[in-house]
Amino acid sequence: MLEDFKRTLSNMFSWIFTVHSTGLRFSSVALFVAVICLLLNWRAAGVIFLIVAFFCAFFFRVPKINVQFNEDEIASPADGTVLSIKTENDPNSVVIRIFMSVFNVHVQRAPVDGKVGEIFYHKGQFLFADKPEAASQNERNLMQFFHKADPNRFAHVEQITGAVARRIECWVKPGQEIKQGNLIGLIRFGSQVAVYLPKNSVRVVVKEGQKVQGGNTVLALWK
């Protein structure tokens, strides 16, 4: 029966966006409980679970993108607001940090065509994702991406949890070939994504405070 609810939800939202399978699981359970509550005439509870079902579908939405990037363009891996653009621990890299509120799309996409390098997972705390200390203290997962045409060009993506986001999903493996815009992972319920680029090889075209969209916005250009 839950599979029927999953198909129903998927069809309901398909004209606006698709819903990732993770979200369909949450939404279908909430919708199932809502129907039971309404059948038992527990209207308030039924309405609450209907809202939960919609919220889960909305949160795990995967918007359809159809952007063709030029060879010199680096795509944003995430939706959100640019928190900072600066050199941090590595003097040869520039780091673009993107804050994702609970209302942003929370899937991440590959910033370049290329190959996945190493993947580094670090356990940590669950501080608010927009705080500076979250970058070094929170649970995080770093995925290395190397450009298909030049392995010296990289665009590493780091998923960072927040106070509400407490689950990182990584959907790629070391050595995997990847296309720009392909889905690479997800962070649940509000978080931060950092993009590491070679400082002397790129020109950043976004600004702090700017809204960006994963797979749609150009973050930087290769020189």
Positions of predicted regions on the chain:
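Contiguous, well-folded functional domains in the mature portion of proteins
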Residues: 1-223
